[in-house]
């Protein structure tokens, strides 16, 4: 007899939870993710009731070929049902979001009626003993509003994704479209258009560098003193006929052509005299709040150089628990959240740590602490922001005890969390003004008065040597400095940058598109489909991606756009809050969407017949050549229109031949000639092997240790 059965979705959590729940009272089992899916037939829902149609679990006996070590869904469900029948209490403890709520509902729905009465739903935002024990003390019923919101999202994605994917596959040989992925693709295409139509503005500046010494007094220890031109002598400007701009929003003088800048620079001679020193101005820099999913993705991608997928994977490991000094420990709170809230208890623990390690003067002013505020955007399921589970476990404690990736991401999260509750940094900025032949210049000196939260970033912050510090105690009005260098420099405005994975996620979040659980796929799915490539971390849309976006925009512009997707996310939130009936919502959308699809099918079918001809014939069968796309969709090539009867093809970047040259030397095993070949996976590496491969697998001894056929 099992006293308490705890059902979770991830097998990786089992080991962590077992430390907190005594084995004689609790048994923990995992669903290994979603326990059942909608059927694929008819998009997986009933068109009369708009309810999901679930697959028959008794027939799902096939194992995932990539995870053969795991049980099939049939075996998992059968095991859970058997254990549930033998249990006194059943705690459904899947993740604290809508996906997790749906997983718990599926387990509940599959149980025998007598076992359903034993079920209670529990959630915890972090896997610590206190959080788990507290959750067991506060069980609740499954929130059917959350479940229905997840149903609606799943059906909506099927409605849009399946129908559009079929159209694209038949017309463009493109693999898929989707409610959110296609909006992300549209962002990429719109940015390409902005770049294409961008016209740069050119201007020139006259930049002066002064020697850092004045009468053998070094006033600037780390570098020369750079001056910014602020005002030109009117008489000089008139005599030289200078073309320049000194707009209010420009800090210096912009010359409109190089000739004017050069004429002015040639007039600058002699010494530069200090004529005024402004009163210092005090500036305060506040720390950022704790991480959300989107801000963690952005920072980890930018600072660690990771992909969005990697950030998600490592964060999940830290949440579920890893081995720390031989003990399984969950290190961070739930990593899928759009909240910046933290509990009062955790805040108190952090403040005690800060006071102990740095002193009470490093604590943030209570009146200035940024509290969690709800704006128009709904914070999904009232999670906390991402933070360490134990603030006393510092990054240094983990440095040599966990994987490098786990350490780096934990360090980002730990520093951001502690810094969010520390005092502002305080900086003084003083403007020093110089004059030369009635032309006025200035420079600014910065000095850090109190480091505050920035103290935590000393080890990982960028180099700040470029910041200018002038020892004002050694400087007075009337001091004169000689120039070290005067230069004329060209500048131009740059086009908007292409998106990186980080900036795309940031843009999608700003537009209220997607949810924390989907940010990873939103950034990566267009790469996987061949609609875009990453070059030096920037997205470049492919020709196929352009065609897909153009067709979707042409026929489904009312669906594949930012405002519609934002509206859909809001509707899903309203379903979760019991403000909207999910079946009525789906019915209204499906009725309108089907008519759009019908119109698009007629239009696309007409275009489909018009193949893109190359205007020459196949050299093998004399049929016309046409343009095609590779299976992945990211490479265009020339192929025969009579495919598959004729398989002739031409690639603009053909794969290098593996065989480089035939040698005079014979194979000692089969007497065929030896050849020099490239390795299959690295074209730069070569080896010598038998030309009779694969019948003969001889490799010359010098290479045998490195290459195996």
Curated annotation (Swiss-Prot):
<keyword id="KW-0677">Repeat</keyword>
<feature type="site" description="Interaction with DNA">
    <location>
        <position position="529"/>
    </location>
</feature>
<feature type="active site" description="O-(5'-phospho-DNA)-tyrosine intermediate">
    <location>
        <position position="334"/>
    </location>
</feature>
<dbReference type="InterPro" id="IPR013497">
    <property type="entry name" value="Topo_IA_cen"/>
</dbReference>
<keyword id="KW-0863">Zinc-finger</keyword>
<comment type="similarity">
    <text>Belongs to the type IA topoisomerase family.</text>
</comment>
<comment type="subunit">
    <text>Monomer.</text>
</comment>
<keyword id="KW-0460">Magnesium</keyword>
<dbReference type="InterPro" id="IPR013825">
    <property type="entry name" value="Topo_IA_cen_sub2"/>
</dbReference>
<dbReference type="Pfam" id="PF01751">
    <property type="entry name" value="Toprim"/>
</dbReference>
<dbReference type="InterPro" id="IPR013824">
    <property type="entry name" value="Topo_IA_cen_sub1"/>
</dbReference>
<feature type="region of interest" description="Interaction with DNA">
    <location>
        <begin position="176"/>
        <end position="181"/>
    </location>
</feature>
<dbReference type="InterPro" id="IPR005733">
    <property type="entry name" value="TopoI_bac-type"/>
</dbReference>
<dbReference type="InterPro" id="IPR028612">
    <property type="entry name" value="Topoisom_1_IA"/>
</dbReference>
<dbReference type="InterPro" id="IPR003601">
    <property type="entry name" value="Topo_IA_2"/>
</dbReference>
<feature type="site" description="Interaction with DNA">
    <location>
        <position position="153"/>
    </location>
</feature>
<feature type="site" description="Interaction with DNA">
    <location>
        <position position="34"/>
    </location>
</feature>
<dbReference type="InterPro" id="IPR023405">
    <property type="entry name" value="Topo_IA_core_domain"/>
</dbReference>
<dbReference type="Pfam" id="PF01131">
    <property type="entry name" value="Topoisom_bac"/>
</dbReference>
<feature type="site" description="Interaction with DNA">
    <location>
        <position position="336"/>
    </location>
</feature>
<dbReference type="InterPro" id="IPR013826">
    <property type="entry name" value="Topo_IA_cen_sub3"/>
</dbReference>
<feature type="domain" description="Toprim">
    <location>
        <begin position="3"/>
        <end position="127"/>
    </location>
</feature>
<dbReference type="GO" id="GO:0003677">
    <property type="term" value="F:DNA binding"/>
</dbReference>
<feature type="zinc finger region" description="C4-type 2">
    <location>
        <begin position="667"/>
        <end position="696"/>
    </location>
</feature>
<dbReference type="InterPro" id="IPR023406">
    <property type="entry name" value="Topo_IA_AS"/>
</dbReference>
<keyword id="KW-0413">Isomerase</keyword>
<feature type="binding site">
    <location>
        <position position="95"/>
    </location>
    <ligand>
        <name>Mg(2+)</name>
    </ligand>
</feature>
<dbReference type="GO" id="GO:0003917">
    <property type="term" value="F:DNA topoisomerase type I (single strand cut, ATP-independent) activity"/>
</dbReference>
<feature type="domain" description="Topo IA-type catalytic">
    <location>
        <begin position="143"/>
        <end position="598"/>
    </location>
</feature>
<keyword id="KW-0479">Metal-binding</keyword>
<feature type="site" description="Interaction with DNA">
    <location>
        <position position="157"/>
    </location>
</feature>
<dbReference type="GO" id="GO:0008270">
    <property type="term" value="F:zinc ion binding"/>
</dbReference>
<feature type="binding site">
    <location>
        <position position="9"/>
    </location>
    <ligand>
        <name>Mg(2+)</name>
    </ligand>
</feature>
<dbReference type="GO" id="GO:0005694">
    <property type="term" value="C:chromosome"/>
</dbReference>
<dbReference type="InterPro" id="IPR006171">
    <property type="entry name" value="TOPRIM_dom"/>
</dbReference>
<keyword id="KW-0799">Topoisomerase</keyword>
<keyword id="KW-0862">Zinc</keyword>
<dbReference type="InterPro" id="IPR000380">
    <property type="entry name" value="Topo_IA"/>
</dbReference>
<dbReference type="Pfam" id="PF01396">
    <property type="entry name" value="Zn_ribbon_Top1"/>
</dbReference>
<dbReference type="InterPro" id="IPR013498">
    <property type="entry name" value="Topo_IA_Znf"/>
</dbReference>
<dbReference type="InterPro" id="IPR003602">
    <property type="entry name" value="Topo_IA_DNA-bd_dom"/>
</dbReference>
<keyword id="KW-0238">DNA-binding</keyword>
